């Protein structure tokens, strides 16, 4: 008998559980093949810890300080140092007010960043908990699905195709597994693991199904030890590069402005040292978009949370910007475009042996199905029995071969009541035909039936049986007998056709990727209105038998196709690769372990609901709800998130140019020294307002969108220059003319620098903050309603700014209130000079894309006279097209706009009802055609009584 070791020795790995016989493993871990009890599992969890890697604890204070450590903050910190070190000259004391103000601005910004990121981090942690790996574990004598984190040494687990091995374990009795250890060892090919072998946490099961006993968890696993030696890295992606580019542009603009001021103020104008420093501080403080990293990060975090509420959990934050730019979506058919709720019409089952009927074929198929942990096919087959227990009634299961992508079938070896051994198998018809070695007329008949099913959009399932005279599970048995073919109907989702239409309107081309036959793909594409321009997977390799495809380059074929049939996972990778070579932003859905390479290769890998652990691990976005509509909703939400970020970056660049150019010209032309403290007030109020943009109401782009730095910089420079010139014009009117006195009847403030300071402060504050309403809108800013928070923040900030301009009397900032009369005049001037900003925006967009004027009149923007943005008109056109497709006469008065006959509400109700009926008819007719043609009838000879 083996020496027993204590838990402490096992924890310290003094016991070689990897090499000792499996029987000794059970002895050392004090467990059995009945599994652990829940109480014992809880005790061991306290000893060995949770089955997850150690998370480094964060120092909250250092994290807070970290928000002050970036290039933009460095510029502000340099300004703070200037205020107390370089400003200490010219017979004046250090500028403590500006120093304190800058530090307050930095602390406010860091505090908001810290709080928002902490909240976002907590929300993300809660979301990622939903993606925590699950495993099938034997506890209290029952198999159940539990979170992998509760596993302890001694637990019995089940590993099947697509699972990521949750802990280091030793395999028990069963068939060998194919294990992909590339994530751990770098081996590109799967390795075969036999009973008794060790499998490592983090590896992926590529084939087979077996039970195993856990020997190590968490940091004690092979993967845990390796991960402990290296620090994780975060891929900053394109977002960080864009952020850096914009930050560098702003810093360079400020540097250029400061250089010009230094070269003119000191050698030419002979300004005093302190006045020059104050003017340089104005450019430094006012020009830096200090809130930019915070605003953009918070916007993405909040957007990610919103996506999760819609059923799309983002594992990689920057996937949001890629989703916004996606223009091609390669979608699985089964479960995404269809319901994956299979049904079998027993009357259409094709039985081949003369001594069997359809019930016998169903029973054979049910025996080759799982009773528990079923997939959609198993559930539909077993569900046809009166009682699911009939599938195992009167037989003893010896061995079950689970489905795998290579064999594409399942099989059971069993003993009947008389003691004879048998096997039954079900699977892809071609595999079953090959298994049975069908020849001649029987093979031709099988293919005719399969093709007949496929033409009507029905999948085929082959069923076979054999006897096993040798009575061993390893023996080949007698020749297989082809039993029959079952038609599987997987109805399209009720919203798939409408969702595909929406996707096309949004500029996203949906391509169907299916492993089914070409005829099934074409029929499904016809029903969903996504086109029938589909090709077999052989065309991807240039082996198509269709002569019309021979001369077409493969990448062009992939780009123009509506979908591909007979696709294997490796084909998906090739499709993504070719689309990316054609400069498309490509999304790919997947659910199986073999989809992982394509999901990783795609710009946006999307693991559908109920995907395997391997597919989830490789994806960027994990869906928690089935269907295509979740993806399209996520596209819209991503575009809205991206629009908010782009709006802010244009705003930030504009403000930098506006502050640098405006104050530089005022300082150099009139030698007017604007107080740095007043720029700080503008910056603080601006930051407070701009933080709300992360929750702003925006209209997503109607086409795929992406970062276009030339658009951001061009728009920012033009708008910023215009605003700077309006400030220069305002100062000239107030400083050198009596324009405001004559126009608004206010007293002149010429020569009164303190009141000029107040007036200039208010003008800069108003137009700077109002700019956000221009950059946030695609159309006219006054017709696209902003979010409530943004509007309230703007009103409060400008109320504070106006009160400061009217009443302030701060000697250290050289400001005295200019009164309500001047404040009113400044507001009128600001409103008048605000109006051309929209026109400038359109001109810039037109110059860059040639499409800007559409934003003034297009139905996709808010500025339109069409009700619901033309939705009713589009629905009417769709309904009319469907009536024509079904041979129905056009309605005479269905869409009559005569308001004397029908009220507008009744008209809309009729239109909705018409559209709903036609959609139902569209689906019903397809089903009727399927059944009628399978019965060998001519549908044209049958009287039609379609009524609407």
Curated annotation (Swiss-Prot):
PROSITE patterns: ATPASE_E1_E2 (PS00154). It is a multi-pass membrane protein. GO terms for molecular function: ATP binding; ATP hydrolysis activity; metal ion binding; P-type proton-exporting transporter activity. One of its GO terms (biological process) is proton export across plasma membrane. The modification Phosphothreonine is found at residues 884, 947. The keyword Iron-sulfur does not apply. Binds to 14-3-3 proteins. The binding is induced by phosphorylation of Thr-947. Binding to 14-3-3 proteins activates the H(+)-ATPase. Belongs to the cation transport ATPase (P-type) (TC 3.A.3) family. Type IIIA subfamily. This is ATPase 8, plasma membrane-type. It comes from Arabidopsis thaliana. The lineage of its organism: Eukaryota, Viridiplantae, Streptophyta, Embryophyta, Tracheophyta. The gene is AHA8.
């Amino acid at each position: 008998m083996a020496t027993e070791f204590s838990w402490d020795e096992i924890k310290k790995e003094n016991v070689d559980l990897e090499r000792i016989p499996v029987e000794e493993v059970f002895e050392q871990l004090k467990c059995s093949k009945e599994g652990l009890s829940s109480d014992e599992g809880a005790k061991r969890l306290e000893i060995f810890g949770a089955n997850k890697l150690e998370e480094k604890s964060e120092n909250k204070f250092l994290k807070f300080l970290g928000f002050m450590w970036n290039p933009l903050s460095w510029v502000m910190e340099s300004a703070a140092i200037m205020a107390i070190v370089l400003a200490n000259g010219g017979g004046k004391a250090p500028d403590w007010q500006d120093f304190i103000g800058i530090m307050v601005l930095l602390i406010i910004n860091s505090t908001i960043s810290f709080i928002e990121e902490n909240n976002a981090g907590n929300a993300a942690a809660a979301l990622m908990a939903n993606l925590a790996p699950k495993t099938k574990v034997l506890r209290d004598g029952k198999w159940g699905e539990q979170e992998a984190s509760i596993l302890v040494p001694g637990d019995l687990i089940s590993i099947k195709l697509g699972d990521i091995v949750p802990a280091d374990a030793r395999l028990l009795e069963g068939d060998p597994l194919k294990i992909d250890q590339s994530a751990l060892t770098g081996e590109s090919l799967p390795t075969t693991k036999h009973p008794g072998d060790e499998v490592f946490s983090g590896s992926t099961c590529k084939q087979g199904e077996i039970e195993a006993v856990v020997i190590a968890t968490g940091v004690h696993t092979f993967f845990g030890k390796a991960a402990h030696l290296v620090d994780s890295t975060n891929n900053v992606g394109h977002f960080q590069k864009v952020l850096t580019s914009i930050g560098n542009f702003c810093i360079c603009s400020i540097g250029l402005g400061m250089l010009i001021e230094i070269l003119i103020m000191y050698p030419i104008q002979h300004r005093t040292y302190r006045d020059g420093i104050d003017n340089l501080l104005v450019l430094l403080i006012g020009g830096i978009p200090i809130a930019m990293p915070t605003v953009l990060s918070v916007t993405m975090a909040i957007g990610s949370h919103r996506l999760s509420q819609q059923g799309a959990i983002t594992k990689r934050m920057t996937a949001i910007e890629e989703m916004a730019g996606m223009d091609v979506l390669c979608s699985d058919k089964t479960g995404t475009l269809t319901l994956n709720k299979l049904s079998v019409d027993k009357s259409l089952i094709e039985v081949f042996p003369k001594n069997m009927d359809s019930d016998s074929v169903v029973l054979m198929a049910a025996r080759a199905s799982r009773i528990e942990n079923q997939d959609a096919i198993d559930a539909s087959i077993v569900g046809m029995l009166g009682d699911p227990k009939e599938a195992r009634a009167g037989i003893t299961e010896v061995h079950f071969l689970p489905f795998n992508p290579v064999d594409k079938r399942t099989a059971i070896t069993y003993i009947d009541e008389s003691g004879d051994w048998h096997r039954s198998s079900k699977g892809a018809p071609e595999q079953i035909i090959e298994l049975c070695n069908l020849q001649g007329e029987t093979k031709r008949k099988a293919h005719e039936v399969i093709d007949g099913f496929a033409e009507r959009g029905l999948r085929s399932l082959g069923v076979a049986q054999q006897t096993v005279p040798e009575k061993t599970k390893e023996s080949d048995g007698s020749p297989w007998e082809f039993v029959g073919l079952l038609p599987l109907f997987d109805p399209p989702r009720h919203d798939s056709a409408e969702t595909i239409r929406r996707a096309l309107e949004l500029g996203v081309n949906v391509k169907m990727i299916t492993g089914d036959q070409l005829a099934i793909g074409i029929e499904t594409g016809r029903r969903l209105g996504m086109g029938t321009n589909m090709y077999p997977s052989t065309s991807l390799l240039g082996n198509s038998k269709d002569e019309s495809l021979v001369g077409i380059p493969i990448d062009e074929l992939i780009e123009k196709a509506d979908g591909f049939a007979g696709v294997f996972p490796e084909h998906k990778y090739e499709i993504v690769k070719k689309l990316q070579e054609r400069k498309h932003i490509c999304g790919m859905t997947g659910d199986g372990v073999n989809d992982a390479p394509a999901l990783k290769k795609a710009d946006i890998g999307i693991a559908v609901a109920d995907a395997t652990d391997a597919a989830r691990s490789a994806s960027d976005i994990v869906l928690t709800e089935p269907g295509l509509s979740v993806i399209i909703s996520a596209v819209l939400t991503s575009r809205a998130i991206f629009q908010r970020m782009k709006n802010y970056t244009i705003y930030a660049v504009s403000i930098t140019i506006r502050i640098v150019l405006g104050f530089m010209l005022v300082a150099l032309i009139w030698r007017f020294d604007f107080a740095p403290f007043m720029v700080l007030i503008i910056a603080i109020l601006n930051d407070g307002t701009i933080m709300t943009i992360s929750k702003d109401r925006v209209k997503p782009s109607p086409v795929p969108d992406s970062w276009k730095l030339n658009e951001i910089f061009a728009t920012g420079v033009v708008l910023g220059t215009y605003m700077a010139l309006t400030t220069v014009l305002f100062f000239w009117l107030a400083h050198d003319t009596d324009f405001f006195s004559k126009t608004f009847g206010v007293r002149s403030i010429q020569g009164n620098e303190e009141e000029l300071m107040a007036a200039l402060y208010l003008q800069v504050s108003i137009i700077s903050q109002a700019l956000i309403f221009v950059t946030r809108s695609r159309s006219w800013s006054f017709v696209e309603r902003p979010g409530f928070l943004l509007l309230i923040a703007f009103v409060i900030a400008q109320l504070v700014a106006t009160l400061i301009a009217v009443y302030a009397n701060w000697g250290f900032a050289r400001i005295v209130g200019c009164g309500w009369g001047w404040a009113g005049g400044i507001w009128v001037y600001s409103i008048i000079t605000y109006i051309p900003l929209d026109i400038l925006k359109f001109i810039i967009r037109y110059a860059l894309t040639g499409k800007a004027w559409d934003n003034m009149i297009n139905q996709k923007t808010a500025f339109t006279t069409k009700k619901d943005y033309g939705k009713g008109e589009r629905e009417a056109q769709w309904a009319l097209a469907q009536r024509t497709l079904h041979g129905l006469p056009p309605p005479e008065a269905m869409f009559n706009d005569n308001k004397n006959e029908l009220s507008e509400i009744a008209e809309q109700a009729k239109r909705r009802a018409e559209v709903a009926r036609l959609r139902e008819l569209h689906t019903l007719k397809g089903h009727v055609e399927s059944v009628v043609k399978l019965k060998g009838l001519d549908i044209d000879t049958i009287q039609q009584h379609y009524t609407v």
